[in-house]
Amino acid sequence: MGRRSGGRKLPFFASNASTSSSTKRTRSARRLPSLTRPRASSSPSPASPSPPPPSASHPAPPSPPLAVSPAGAGKVGKKKAGARLWMRLDRWGVSETLHLDKGSIIRRAGLPPRDLRILGPVFSDSSSILAREKAMVINLEFIRAIVTADEILLLDPLTIDVIPFVEQLTHHLPLKNLVCGNGQPGGDDHGEKHDDSPGDQVPRLNEATGAEHELPFEFQVLELALETVCSSFDVNVSGLERRATPVLEELTKNVSTRNLDRVRTLKSDLTRLLAHVQKVRDEIEHLLDDNEDMAHLYLTRKQLQNQQVEALISSAASNSIVPGGTSLSRLNNSFRRSVSIATSMHLDNDVEDLEMLLEAYFMQLDGIRNRILSVREYIDDTEDYVNIQLDNQRNELIQLQLTLTIASFGIAVNTFIAGAFAMNIQSKLYSIDDGSFFWPFVGGTSSGCFMICIVLLWYARWKKLLGP
């Protein structure tokens, strides 16, 4: 059995087995140019076909540069320099986290580099909503994202403040009513059904702009972002209101350094929160004042325009009626004009939908701002009340000081009289030895000084320098 199994080797492999490993490498290296010789020297006559090469029946091994080694695989998975963590979520609910650098983001979303600086740490405290050709840049407090017509790229999705926004995105996506051409059979307003036409592969513009009650993908993301930011503001304002009530009541009862420091911290937090709310409110107000900016935020409409124009051009190019390139260019211009007219019919409605969305959150932010201002007014009223208390105490101290000054003046007059008679001068009063003059004199001077104090106090009350 061993002999038979050993004797079944093919002659080709038997000859290869007898050669060395270096001969194998040499033959395999020589075989590569031999594959191209018959093709280069093959004659056009079919009478003498060239025999196929020996290696034609066997698939050629892959080229060495395409083979990925384990070390190469580790380099591919390594994080690039300057890359940041992003989460990608499309309208169908498919999400993934990946590290992307600025160049990848610029190529993916078609944004200029200056827009990515807005999402950097330098402008982290600013609030802005920018509309570009293919994307919308959202920088609202802790939410920094790039939204296109089909997906959202969220920066730093694992932070504590951004996690509620991620949960809302995953809860609301995928969209309930996706406007796609291949999802439902197409039909126009006259009941005609389109079969096997390129226009069926593209969403219809009237369905995406006017007929759908559901907002486009980018507006839904914007709504969730504004809702998350407003909810965060609401929670912070509620916390400040709960903190403010006991602190201010304690301050009215006891004006101490500790209570004043607590009120100072509360007031600084309130001022900082008011600044953040005011920034978001001003950005929404800026968008509401400019209808053109709101129209540029409609990314789905732009995408549908481009897709419809491309579909109509491709269908016209495949039509045999079109004779040449000149007619095709004219037809291209006519198609673009027709699409622009169709989109302008729905432009006001789209802007109205976005305007209603922004006005709702503008009113909510305005209400949050009014709550902050009411708490601030409460703090100001408490400070005024404390200042009134301090002024009252200061007035009482001044009255006490005035009373003591008047009493000191009377005592000083009595002391002056006693000091004058204590001097070593000649007087007949010193010859009186029975003491009948001393006590009446002391009593008279003391009574006179007391009367002086009474007169001064009465004068101070008459001038309302002292309280009743």
Swiss-Prot record:
Going by the entry's taxonomy, the superkingdom of the source organism is recorded as Eukaryota
Keyword Transmembrane applies: yes
Which organism is this entry from? Answer: Oryza sativa subsp. indica
Bias class Low complexity marks the residues at 14-23, 31-45
What is this protein's name? Putative magnesium transporter MRS2-G
Q: Spell out the CDD domains in the cross-references.
A: Mrs2_Mfm1p-like (cd12823)
Q: Residue spans with biased composition (Pro residues)?
A: 46-67
> Pfam families under this entry?
MRS2-like
Q: What does this protein do?
A: Putative magnesium transporter.
One of the record's GO cellular component terms:
membrane
